[in-house]
From Swiss-Prot:
Compositionally biased tracts (Low complexity): 103-121
Protein name, as recorded: Chromosomal replication initiator protein DnaA
Chain intervals for the UniProt region annotation (Disordered): 103-150
Region (Domain III, AAA+ region): 165-381
Entry's localization field: Cytoplasm
Organism: Pseudomonas fluorescens (strain SBW25)
Keywords: ATP-binding, Cytoplasm, DNA replication, DNA-binding, Lipid-binding, Nucleotide-binding
Renumbered residue ranges of the record's region Domain II: 91-164
Domain text: Domain I is involved in oligomerization and binding regulators, domain II is flexibile and of varying length in different bacteria, domain III forms the AAA+ region, while domain IV binds dsDNA.
GO MF: ATP binding; ATP hydrolysis activity; DNA replication origin binding; lipid binding
Summary of subunit composition and partner proteins: Oligomerizes as a right-handed, spiral filament on DNA at oriC.
Basic and acidic residues bias spans: 122-134
Annotated coiled-coil segments of the chain: none
Length: 501
């Protein structure tokens, strides 16, 4: 009965709609019935969305009018009809089978059913995008309840959701805050708590493994917590490029634009990969403008300051600076210890404070490497059946510790500082006391104290045979200047990033 009812409705739609619209949107739909359920299959996500948005209210009206008051349960899915029915999901009348079809409910507040004449008018005014369309949701696994239509009443048990690709484990609650990331965390929270009215765009930059992606996911998760129906999409910049290439291949660039410009928040990681991709930059430029003009939130990350991204158009660099640009720095010692203690607590592992301090002193580059080292220590402890001690840490991380000592040496620090300040290494070792030499020398000594395991006398010895009190004075002086002098603070951060990345 349901299939015959559907065919009757299709014939009525054929009379109502222009031939091109009917052939593009209605004819490709396939249908199968099981009991009082009518399953309508669209060939891809875009056709499904378009039918949902433009024609569903009229379809439901026709089913109700010609179903003698017993309209079937209607399910819109992506795929094609099969001999075997999709499996039912718990708490939902219908769910998509793994790879052949996926359930996709329509919007939560369907428009009132229009009259036949208004349906014709609205349909005629609709833009006609490509039929062979880009499917930005391909491979999504979310399963939702179908639409129900009963006695002129449309009850929607689920809402169509963009796949967010967010990692639910990255939240503000488990983000360890310290001086190095305090401003970035505060800015991210402001955006999450007050989107569209805070900083737009928010641009986070810094080296790998410092927490930029964590903060970005935390914002997205908080936005969805506040509004589960929000369209929040996270992706790597290379995914944006791949989607655009796919859209061009399918002659479906309009669908690509429609998808990315319809989100409430767009979160793109590693924006530096847009460099020298002219068509991608062109498309993102217009997408970026459309989102900001529409009041939608944009968050971007990069491994460097936007002005320093070579191969990126100046107009993009300029727009990235419209909102707030914040650096995420390598964590200082106290923050590294706090991260280790928190991760150990989450893993329900007893990590002595002195052991955490030992690891944090030697693993300085980024949080990702720090967590990796802790996992190795925990695994070693578990397999050996021993408590975590400094001795066990030395055993489990011996290759990593040896590599760290080799990479960050006093010689390397002296060479890097000399290049940065455009002086000679011999100047750092000389007795010259002019500020242009003395200040870089003090910076190099402070970095040597922080990044190596050498004692103060050993550091003084390799800086021209200076006394350990001279090294101590240099370290204290640089710490004071980092608080009061923005130039010294920026120089020190840049050098620290260079030496530990």
């Amino acid at each position: 009965m349901s299939v015959e009812l559907w065919q009757q409705c299709v014939e009525l739609l054929r009379d109502e709609l222009p031939a091109q619209q009917f052939n593009t949107w209605i004819r490709p739909l396939q249908v199968e019935a099981e009991g009082d359920e009518l399953r309508v299959y669209a060939p891809n996500r875009f056709v499904l969305d378009w039918v949902n948005e433009k024609y569903l209210s009229r379809v439901l009206e026709l089913l109700d009018e010609h179903g003698n008051g017993l309209a079937p349960v209607l399910s819109l899915l992506i795929g094609s009809k099969r001999s075997s029915a999709p499996r039912a999901a718990p708490n939902a009348p219908l769910a998509a089978a793994a790879s052949q079809a996926q359930a996709a409910p329509v919007a939560s507040t369907p428009a009132p059913a229009p009259s036949k004449s208004s349906a014709k008018k609205n349909a005629a005014e609709n833009e006609e995008p490509s039929r062979d369309s880009f499917d930005p949701m391909a491979g999504a696994s979310s399963q939702q309840a179908p639409i129900r239509a009963e006695q002129r009443t449309v009850q929607v048990e689920g809402a169509l959701k963009h796949t967010s690709y967010l990692n639910r484990t990255f939240t503000f609650e488990n983000f360890v805050e310290g001086k190095s990331n305090q401003l970035a965390r505060a800015a991210a929270w402001q955006v999450a708590d007050n989107p569209k009215h805070g900083y737009n765009p928010l641009f986070l930059y810094g080296g790998v493994g410092l927490g930029k992606t964590h903060l970005m996911h935390a914002v997205g998760n908080h936005l969805l917590k506040k509004n589960p129906n929000a369209k929040v999409v996270y992706l790597h910049s290379e995914r944006f490029v791949a989607d655009m290439v796919k859209a061009l291949q399918l002659n479906a660039i309009n669908e690509f634009k429609r998808f990315y410009r319809s989100v409430d928040a767009l979160l793109i990681d590693d924006i530096q990969f847009f460099a020298r991709k002219e068509r991608s930059q062109e498309e993102f430029f217009h997408t970026f403008n459309a989102l900001l003009e529409g009041g939608q939130q944009v968050i971007l990350t990069s491994d460097r300051y936007p002005k320093e991204i070579e191969g990126l158009e100046e107009r993009l660099k300029s727009r990235f600076g419209w909102g707030l640009t914040v650096a995420v720095e390598p964590p200082e010692l106290e923050t590294r210890v706090a991260i280790l203690m928190k991760k150990a607590d989450q893993a329900k592992v007893d990590l002595p404070h002195d052991a955490a301090f030992f690891i944090a002193q030697r693993i300085r580059s980024n949080v990702r490497e720090l967590e990796g080292a802790l996992k190795r220590v925990i695994a070693h402890s578990h397999f050996m059946g021993r408590d975590i001690t400094i001795e066990l840490i030395r055993e489990s991380l011996k290759d990593l510790l040896a590599l760290q000592d080799k990479l960050v040496s006093v010689d390397n620090i002296q060479r890097t500082v000399a290049e940065y300040y455009k002086i000679k290494i011999s100047d750092l070792l000389s007795k010259r006391r002019s500020r242009s030499v003395a200040r870089p020398r003090q910076v190099a000594m402070a970095l040597s104290k922080e990044l190596t395991n050498h004692s103060l006398p050993e550091i003084g010895d390799v800086f021209g045979g200076r006394d350990h009190t001279t090294v101590l004075h240099a370290c204290r002086k640089i710490n004071e200047l980092k608080e009061s002098d923005a130039d010294i603070r920026e120089d020190y951060k840049n050098l620290l990033r260079t030496l530990t990345t």
